[in-house]
Amino acid sequence: DMGAVPLHSCCPYLCGNTPRPNEQVAWGESSAVVFANSILGARANREGGPSALASSITGKSPLYGYRLNRNRRSTDIIGIDAKLRSITDFGALGYSVGKIVKDGVPFFKGMSDPSVDELKMLGAALASSGAVALFHVDGVTPEADGISGYFKEDKPQEIEIGQKHVDEAYYMLSKATEKSVDVVCVGCPHCSIQEVAEVARLLRGKRVDSHIALWICTSSPVKALAD
């Protein structure tokens, strides 16, 4: 009755709610906020549930934070000297960098043509280990228009991330001691149709063990498309 469209997803941008560049949005999901700011070039802060709901009712949100140009400038230059072979490696990279920059705005250089899903994973990890709501990738994301003049400080902090940092992130996040598993769950953030297709490709001609549950978490629209 109030005009709401229930999406039930942490990735509304995969379900038709895709903000345009410079569009002001109010979302309460940290991984969605960093995606909107970084990949889409929209304007969003990390909202709480009550403030996002208030914005949906009033159509207004406080003008501060990442809604302002001056706060969207990078604080740190991140050099990458690690092999990023899979989407999981981007998660490990984001986890490592997020712990270092906290709530900063990292500028990544040396990243070779990442996919949207890889950037989605990078942003989600940055937002979880730190409080990153915006990042830039040189030559890739819409506001990363070169190093010159795009930093808050005259001499921003330069951070080199090597293979050891990525490996350490895997170690920190992999504390399982048992060799067997009961449940395998993928889809945090929710899987895109490309990620669902990749799982299907990996399982082609194979069967999941009857003692193991495989969960693929995604949105209703993506599931309908996959079906």
Where are these regions (language model features)?
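Short connector loops at secondary-structure junctions
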Residues: 12-18, 142, 217-223
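Intrinsically disordered, low-complexity segments enriched in small residues
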Residues: 3-5, 29-220
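Glycine-centered loop/turn motifs
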Residues: 19-26
